[in-house]
């Protein structure tokens, strides 16, 4: 299986949204385009048009990796993957393996530690060892490969083998990986601070302060 960059992003988004927002799944073309272009949990950030997403969708439909779900109304086509864990797919993953594949499709090569941090909404890993165990199973199935350790880094990154990867991603500087993870952690902390501020305002309003 060799997926183009746009096809990888679409499959990754369908896997992600099926797990994180099942009430809104399958996805319409508009929802899928928004998912492909969202800035969080994506690397690189894309700016695909509806037409570009539709072209990649049609290719995936022809490859029997995506199907159209017309729904009860039949007015808006919605798209559902047949990539894995369905009666139409030969790929069968555990919840942990599925989460890893999803993130590798959405963000490219990552270390086990990065995967554990980012998998929270997709699957539960008790430790980095659990991540490495799932990765090794995927390596045995020729779905994932382990990259050479980068200079100055303790951990190796892992990359999926479902399509071509940019050379720049395979040879990414170590500093960039660290900066990306720090930025992600900072954004999560800022979001938590905003939530706490909102709760504090509600408490003050309730107490008449």
From Swiss-Prot:
- The protein's superkingdom reads Bacteria
Q: Which Pfam families match?
A: DUF480 (PF04337)
In which family does this protein belong, per the annotation?
Answer: Belongs to the UPF0502 family.
Q: What is this protein called?
A: UPF0502 protein PSHAa0076
Organism the protein comes from: Pseudoalteromonas translucida (strain TAC 125)
